């Protein structure tokens, strides 16, 4: 039986790669074919574009939310981690869904490598580079799908 507040293992999730200027968003499900990049949300001086986030939430109706936890390579805290945790708390309050944190170390590097491969194969163009944040979010969702027990439930 899943832990109270945990995301259903067969549920649909939205994943987030939180940055200071943009937030990548992806959707995934254990019943589907992994994860898919779906949006890049702008972050303004007063915070993320909640209207755009509300639209994505309404479109996908997730059972839970997965936020990348940006630890340093030596497991230390950093400003990006505080920002990601604050965003995760805002998501939980706004949507009343379970929110988990998953280690996102090297997710942006992995997304950049995928983008480079897809570009070399002719499936992506240079102008598609903005979608890199959403591709990083897809990596985060795939990590959760592969090992949901490695996620930390947002306290």
From Swiss-Prot:
Q: Which GO terms describe its cellular component?
A: cytosol
* A biological process term (GO) from this entry: rRNA 5'-end processing
Domain of life of the source = Bacteria
Question: Does the keyword Cytoplasm belong to this entry?
Answer: yes
Q: What class of enzyme is it?
A: hydrolase
**InterPro entries cross-referenced by the UniProt entry:** RNaseH-like_sf, YqgF, YqgF/RNaseH-like_dom, YqgF/RNaseH-like_dom_sf
**Which UniProt keywords are present, listed alphabetically?**
Cytoplasm, Hydrolase, Nuclease, Ribosome biogenesis
A single Gene Ontology MF term assigned here is: nuclease activity
- Which Pfam family, any one, appears in the UniProt record? RuvX
Localization annotation:
Cytoplasm
Which EC numbers characterise this protein's activity in its record? 3.1.-.-
Q: Which PANTHER family match?
A: POLYNUCLEOTIDYL TRANSFERASE, RIBONUCLEASE H-LIKE SUPERFAMILY PROTEIN
Q: Which family does it belong to?
A: Belongs to the YqgF nuclease family.
What task does this protein carry out? Answer: Could be a nuclease involved in processing of the 5'-end of pre-16S rRNA.
Its protein name is Putative pre-16S rRNA nuclease
């Amino acid at each position: 039986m899943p832990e109270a507040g945990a995301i259903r293992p067969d549920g649909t999730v939205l994943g987030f790669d939180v940055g200071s200027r943009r937030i990548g968003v992806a959707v995934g499900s254990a019943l589907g074919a992994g994860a898919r990049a779906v949006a890049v949300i702008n972050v303004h001086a007063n915070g993320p574009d909640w209207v755009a986030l509300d639209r994505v939430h309404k479109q996908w109706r997730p059972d839970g939310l997965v936020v990348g936890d940006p630890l340093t390579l030596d497991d230390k805290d950093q400003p990006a981690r505080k920002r990601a945790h604050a965003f995760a708390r805002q998501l939980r309050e706004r949507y009343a869904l379970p929110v988990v944190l998953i280690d996102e170390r090297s997710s942006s590097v992995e997304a950049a490598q995928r983008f480079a491969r897809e570009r070399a194969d002719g499936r992506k163009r240079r102008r598609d580079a903005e979608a890199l944040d959403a591709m990083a979010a897809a990596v985060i969702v795939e990590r959760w799908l592969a090992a949901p027990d490695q996620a930390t439930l947002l306290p």
